[in-house]
Amino acid sequence: RVMTHLRELEEADANPVLARVKRVLEALTSLHITTGLAAGSLAYVGAVLMGLHFRLDFFLLVFFYVQAMHVLNRFTETGVDKFRDDPKRQEIYRRHRIILWVLGIVPFAASIVLGFMLGVWPFLVVLIASILGLLYSVKVVPKSWMGLFGFRRLKDLAASKNVFVASAWALVSIFPLFFVEEQTTQPSRLLLSFVFLFVVTGIRSIWLDLSDLAADRLVGRETVPLVLGPTRTHSLVRTLIVGLSVGLYLAAALGWLPGIAWILATWILLEFLYLELLYRGNALPTLERDMLVDLHFIVAGLLAFVWRALG
């Protein structure tokens, strides 16, 4: 950490503008602002796939929910950060703990209020997803029942973290919009859009966990990389990416999804090849890693926006 700090001082002296930009980006990723933007962008992609109108309040609902859940889960999983070799991020969390609480509670309340304003069903979707997210690290099963269930917390279930993250993102991104919009969408589009969001957010969660194996093992957080190991996890991610791209191509060719599916499938494959060829076997620094996975979703949202605008 001392060497890292010295390198940062050298970079700041050599290029103060770049150092300032990196500090801003570090704050945005540490506070999960970029994660919220990525989630909102992905929700827009889901709306385009379903052929539904997308409004600002839907974007804000997803943005606030995802950003709040990521921040609040840092308080329910205390002790994880000290196992990560990420001194800059640890310093942000240590110095700005009150701000973190505010950035968790206020957006969480905003997502609940927005869900309520959109209607009964959107409110219930957000409420249920929020309760499950907050209960993830809480001991919900009494100790005396441990022998019957085999677990006390939801996070004790094998690979539970990745499944819960993907399910929450997909549920909040798809169903509030589906329940509110008056236009009808085909059941096949609803199902395929949900599967698309579930898979891409699941891949994101798994890929991030590959670099946090040591911390997850120490705190007992069950993830796919811990269950399968790094080698088999990489194989699983490759299979999911290729399968998702092929599925999008087929769905577009059969008319089950609109033409944007062609573009999304190609974008996913290009991103996959970029990661395989450029970063194979190399661990990315935390800032670059988080920015890369979030920008992947943000660019997908921009592609969907341009496609709809031109169409």
Give a label for each model feature:
Residues A12-L37, V80-L103, V120, L135-S167, ...:
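Interhelical loop and helix-boundary elements at the membrane-water interface
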Residues L37-G40, L103-A109, F164-F175, R238-V246, ...:
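Core segments of transmembrane alpha-helices
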Residues G40, Y44, V62-R74, F108, ...:
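Central hydrophobic cores of alpha-helical transmembrane segments in multi-pass inner-membrane proteins
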Residues G51-L72, L127-I131, T185-W207:
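Membrane-embedded alpha-helical segments that form the functional core of polytopic membrane enzymes
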Residues H53-F58, W101-G147, S235-T286:
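Transmembrane helix-loop-helix
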Residues Q67-V106, G115, T201-V242:
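Solvent-exposed interhelical
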Residues A158, N162-I206, L213:
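Functional transmembrane core segments of multi-pass inner-membrane proteins
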Residues F305-G311:
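Juxtamembrane boundary at the C-terminal end of a transmembrane helix
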